[in-house]
């Protein structure tokens, strides 16, 4: 079986090598160099975040968030089960218990109306996941967190350049985490991430945590005569080579964003009749949300139809894939967490969701081939 249209192809804009060569010539490769500063400044301007720090991955950003929130053994952290394992791992590593709640069927995001019932005296934080770059209902979640004096972390791995009521995702919670993995809209050469710090008096501490728990940044700025181990931390810097690759992409981020939205809209327009016939459902975009075209999915009647469509597309040379297996159904999810309330949508919706190819360098001809193959399946 020859796959000629991959599910994903890392974005390439053409200036990456030139920027990497500049970074190599600078003699500064280990991070926090000129390209790191350019990326962080771009993200701060784009999002309005108080401070953005590049990290080796979104996983690392989430782990930094758990340290900054001083997560301790026995604390509870509320999140959706329909997410990537890093969302939970970051907090479990600090000793927390994960409390899963159900998702909304329209957006696949955490159901904001189910959170309050999961809050206990041990609850420390709420982690929201903006699935497919579509925002969670942030106003009600932030109001709930404020009433109960809880922290909110945005897992915005898929949500760079996506907005909620005009506010950049990642800038609304107390902390926000981005991914620049090769599957995301913008990549730092395969792996990468960023932590958005929206509480000003956490910025200095975040720099310490990021530098292995030392005040190295203060030393470089001349605020300390030597740097010392201050507290718990780890090596959370992105290399300057990767920052150079990322800056090439951020420099044309609007172009990448526009192209992905064009592909997303073409899928939506061409496949809308399937929804009208009742054989498939699409992601619904709430009016408060401005998405970024991160991914396009169909929801089929059930898992067997999804499997049949995957096989049909593969026979047409097209790779389409499903997504997360809910964490609460996994061995580690059962060991380190619990599901509160009814699992009305998490499992059943995850079993019928299928993602179609969508990437920046995808040609119009490839898009039309995918559309044609999907339509053919439902006509057969």
Task: Describe each PLM feature range.
Residues 75, 81-83, 102-104, 156, ...:
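Nucleotide-sugar donor-binding loop of glycosyltransferases
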Residues 29-76, 90-94, 100-102, 167:
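Phosphate-binding glycine-rich loop
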Residues 1-30, 228-230, 357:
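N-terminal "arm"/small-domain region of PLP-dependent enzymes with the aminotransferase-like
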Residues 37-41, 46-52, 113, 117, ...:
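PLP-dependent aminotransferase class I/II
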Residues 94, 147-148, 316:
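Helix C-cap/helix->beta junction micro-motif
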Residues 63-119, 125-127, 312:
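Conserved PLP-anchoring active-site segment centered on the Schiff-base-forming lysine
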Residues 106-188, 194-201, 355:
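Active-site phosphate-binding strand-loop segment of PLP-dependent enzymes
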């Amino acid at each position: 079986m020859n796959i000629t249209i991959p599910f994903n192809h890392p974005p390439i804009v053409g200036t990456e090598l030139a920027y990497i060569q500049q970074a190599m010539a600078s003699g500064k490769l280990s991070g926090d160099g000129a390209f790191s500063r350019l990326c962080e400044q771009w993200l701060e301007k784009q999002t309005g975040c108080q401070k953005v720090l590049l990290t080796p991955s979104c996983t690392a950003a989430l782990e930094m968030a758990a340290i900054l929130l001083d997560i301790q053994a026995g604390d509870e952290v509320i999140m959706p089960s329909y997410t990537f394992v890093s969302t939970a791992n970051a907090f479990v590593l600090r000793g927390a218990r994960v409390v899963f709640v159900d998702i909304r069927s329209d957006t696949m995001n955490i159901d904001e109306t189910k959170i309050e019932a999961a809050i206990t005296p041990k609850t420390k934080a709420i982690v929201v996941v903006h699935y497919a770059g579509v925002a969670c209902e942030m106003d009600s979640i932030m109001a709930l967190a404020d009433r109960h004096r809880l922290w909110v972390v945005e897992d915005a791995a898929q949500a760079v350049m996506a907005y909620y009521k005009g506010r950049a995702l990642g800038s609304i919670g107390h902390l926000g985490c981005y991914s620049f993995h090769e599957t995301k809209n913008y990549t730092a050469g395969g792996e990468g991430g960023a932590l958005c710090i929206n509480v000003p008096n956490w910025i200095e501490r975040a720099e310490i945590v990021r530098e292995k728990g030392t005040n190295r940044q203060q030393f470089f700025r001349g605020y300390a005569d030597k740097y010392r181990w201050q507290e718990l931390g780890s090596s959370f810097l992105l290399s300057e080579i990767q920052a150079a690759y990322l800056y090439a992409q951020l420099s044309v981020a609007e172009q990448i964003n526009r192209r992905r939205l064009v592909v997303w809209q073409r899928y939506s327009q061409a496949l809308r009749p399937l929804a009208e016939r009742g054989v498939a459902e699409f992601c619904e975009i709430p009016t408060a949300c401005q998405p970024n075209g991160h991914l396009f999915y169909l929801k089929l009647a059930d898992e067997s139809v999804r499997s049949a469509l995957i096989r049909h597309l593969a026979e047409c040379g097209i790779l389409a894939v499903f997504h997360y297996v809910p964490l609460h159904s996994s061995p580690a999810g059962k060991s380190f967490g619990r599901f509160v309330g009814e699992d009305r949508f998490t499992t059943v919706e995850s079993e019928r969701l299928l993602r179609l190819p969508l990437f920046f360098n995808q040609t119009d001809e490839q898009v039309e081939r995918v559309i044609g193959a999907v339509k053919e399946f439902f006509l057969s």
